[in-house]
Design a protein with these regions (language model features):
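Electropositive
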Residues: 57-89
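C-terminal motif of bacterial Sec signal peptides marking the signal peptidase cleavage site
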Residues: 17-20
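Exported/periplasmic cell-wall-interacting domains
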Residues: 26, 68-71, 89-190
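Post-signal peptide N-terminal segment of mature Sec-exported envelope proteins
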Residues: 27-50
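Bacterial N-terminal signal peptides that target proteins for export
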Residues: 2-10
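Bacterial signal peptide processing site
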Residues: 22-24
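Structural motif
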Residues: 41-43, 78, 119
C-alpha cells in the first residue's frame, strides 16, 4: 500500500510539472481602456481611464442584435478583446481565416467585402453574447467604407482601415467592449 501511495504522489508531481512547463504566460489585460459601441448611433467611443480619447463611425449587423449561431447579428453586452491580429499589415490587406493573403483591396472596391487591415477578435463575457468568439465576431477593417455609419455587416463591427489601424495601436488584449442598443449619450452616463 505505501508503494502505491508513493507512486500516486510521483505521478501527481510529474503531471503538475508537465502542466507548468506547458503554461504560456499571457500579457496582462488592458484595464485602462474601454470601447463603447452604440448600435442606434453606429458610433464607437474609446475611453482611457474613463476619459474619452476617440470617437469613430462604425457599421454593425444589418440583421440587428443577437448571438445565435449563423444569425449574422451583432451580439450586445459586455465583451473583451480576446486577440489582436494584423500587426504591421498595410491598410486594405486582406485577412482570410485570420491570416494575410498578400492581397490589398482599396476602399470601396466594387464587389469586394473581405476582412481587411486589422482584427480585434471579441469574446463574450455574458450569457447573451457567449457565442461571440466561436462566431468569429470581430472589430475589423472593411473595404466597404461608404457603408460605415449604417448597419451593413454580417455581425462584426466594421471600421474604416485608417480608423482600425489607429485604434489597434492604442489598445491591448483584454480591453473591455460594451455594445448596446442605446445612444452613446446614455452609455457615457454610466
Amino acid at each position: 500500500m505505501p508503494i502505491m501511495k508513493l507512486r500516486t504522489v510521483w505521478l501527481a508531481l510529474a503531471a503538475g510539472l508537465l502542466s507548468a512547463c506547458q503554461h504560456v504566460p499571457q500579457a496582462p489585460a488592458d484595464t485602462h481602456h474601454q470601447l463603447l459601441i452604440s448600435i442606434p448611433d453606429q458610433q464607437m467611443v474609446l475611453l482611457e481611464d474613463g476619459a474619452e480619447q476617440g470617437r469613430w463611425p462604425v457599421s454593425t449587423a444589418r440583421r440587428g442584435v443577437g448571438d445565435e449561431p449563423d444569425s449574422y447579428m451583432t451580439p450586445a453586452g459586455e465583451l473583451e478583446v480576446a486577440e489582436k491580429i494584423g500587426d504591421g499589415l498595410a491598410p486594405g490587406s486582406v485577412l482570410k481565416d485570420r491570416k494575410p493573403t498578400g492581397e490589398i483591396v482599396g476602399a470601396d472596391a466594387p464587389g469586394r467585402d473581405p476582412v481587411v487591415t486589422r482584427i480585434l477578435w471579441l469574446r463574450g463575457l455574458e450569457a447573451r453574447n457567449r457565442n461571440a468568439y466561436q462566431r468569429f465576431i470581430y472589430i475589423h477593417g472593411t473595404p466597404q467604407e461608404s457603408l460605415i455609419g449604417q448597419p451593413a455587416s454580417y455581425g462584426c463591427i466594421r471600421m474604416r482601415s485608417a480608423d482600425i489601424t489607429g485604434l489597434y495601436a492604442r489598445i491591448g488584449a483584454g480591453t473591455r467592449v460594451r455594445i448596446e442598443e442605446q445612444p452613446l449619450s446614455e452609455m457615457l452616463r454610466r
